[in-house]
Swiss-Prot record:
Gene3D superfamilies assigned: Ribonuclease P, Pop5 subunit
Name of the protein this chain belongs to: Ribonuclease P protein component 2
Gene Ontology cellular component list: cytoplasm; ribonuclease P complex
Keywords: Cytoplasm, Endonuclease, Hydrolase, Nuclease, tRNA processing
Biological source species: Methanococcus maripaludis (strain DSM 14266 / JCM 13030 / NBRC 101832 / S2 / LL)
Xref: InterPro entries: Pop5/Rpp14/Rnp2-like (IPR002759), Rnp2-like_sf (IPR038085), Rnp2_archaea (IPR016434)
EC numbers on record: 3.1.26.5
Enzymatic class: hydrolase
Length: 130
């Protein structure tokens, strides 16, 4: 059985609040592909793997992205150079960067933070999807 890493050895993360300006509404898969393609075009495979982008939350046009702490500047520059997606203009604006999802939601997205267990309770009350 594998042991979990202690906090001192874990990878340091930053959370980025994004605003995506695009003609149509993008799905989560599209947002992930746009961010990864921007990183691949700017810094290659090695830079993309070091940045380790992970989409935490997305509701058109805002999203929260988790990245490595050391690669914040790489993400900023690669997203600023991103010009088009599917031959249509796209602009990805970074609203803010923080070290916790709670601060991102409250400070930059102006959404009250709900603890995870409350979200699960709401989903259980709604019942299964049909």
């Amino acid at each position: 059985m594998l042991k979990t890493l202690p906090p001192t050895l874990r990878e340091k993360k930053r959370y980025v609040a994004l605003e995506i300006i695009y003609e149509m509404e993008l799905s989560q898969k599209d947002v992930i592909s746009v961010v990864r393609n921007a990183l691949l075009n700017y810094s290659g495979v090695l830079g993309c793997s070091r940045t380790n982008p992970w989409l935490i939350d997305y509701g058109h046009p805002y999203g929260i992205l988790r990245i490595s702490r050391e690669e914040v500047d790489t993400l900023r520059s690669s997203l600023s150079l991103m010009g088009e997606h599917k031959k249509k203009p796209i602009n990805i604006r970074i609203i803010g960067i923080s070290n916790s999802v709670k601060h991102i939601r409250e400070k930059f997205l102006h959404v009250p933070h709900e603890p995870y267990y409350k979200v699960i309770q709401k989903l259980k009350r709604k019942g299964p999807k049909k």
